[in-house]
Every structure is written in C-alpha cells, then in structure tokens.
C-alpha cells in the first residue's frame, strides 16, 4: 500500500514539473526508464553570472518507497567542482536533503540545488 501512495505522489510531482517547469533556472526532468517513476534524470543549466554559466549538468534522482517521508537520493552525474558536491560520486551536501521535511516539493529541492 505504501508503494502505491508513493507512486501517486511521484506522478503528481513529475506531472507538475513537466507542466510548469522551472524554466527560470533552466531545469528539465525526465524518467531514466519510461515506466519507472522512482528514477529521474534531471538537466540543469548553470546559473548566469557564475563560473557554471553556459554549462549543462545532469543529475539522477532516486526515490524509495518511503518518499515523500524520506528524501530522494540526488547526485550529479556530470563532473562538477563545488564545495558541496562530492568529486567522487556527485553526492550533494544540501541542508534541504540532510534535514528533510516530509512533503518538501521537488521544485523547492531543485531550486536549492540550482542556487548552491
């Protein structure tokens, strides 16, 4: 039963991000496998007026059956040099993820990653 509620929540979040993308920060979201809502591919443009400007960065977001009560696992798959991103595995050190508040919208999470 828990997995079904997670799937419904992920459907809602995914649909919202695709109907109303974060275009002001150049972010798009897709599924890694067309029939698997638990694994997303995210593309993010580097912020203007930053050392990342002009760059296109890819991230993977993995959700488990406890989402949204548990945070997603989000990692950069594009190599990026940043104090809050592990050069080894792309793990993001972000308070939004470390101190997760259930039902935090993915739009908010992605925005916080963008402004790192």
Indicate where each model-derived feature is located:
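UBC/E2-like fold recognition across ubiquitin and ubiquitin-like conjugation systems
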Residues: 1-56, 60-116
């Amino acid at each position: 039963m828990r997995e079904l509620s997670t799937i419904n929540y992920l459907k809602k979040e995914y649909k919202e991000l695709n109907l109303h993308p974060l275009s002001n920060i150049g972010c798009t979201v897709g599924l890694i496998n067309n029939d698997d809502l638990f694994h997303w591919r995210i593309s993010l443009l580097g912020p203007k007026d930053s050392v990342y400007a002009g760059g296109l960065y890819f991230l993977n977001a993995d959700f488990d059956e406890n989402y949204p009560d548990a945070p997603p696992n989000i990692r950069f798959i594009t190599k990026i040099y940043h104090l809050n991103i592990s050069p080894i595995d792309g793990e993001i050190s972000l308070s939004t993820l470390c101190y997760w508040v259930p039902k935090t919208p993915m739009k908010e999470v992605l925005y916080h990653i963008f402004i790192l």
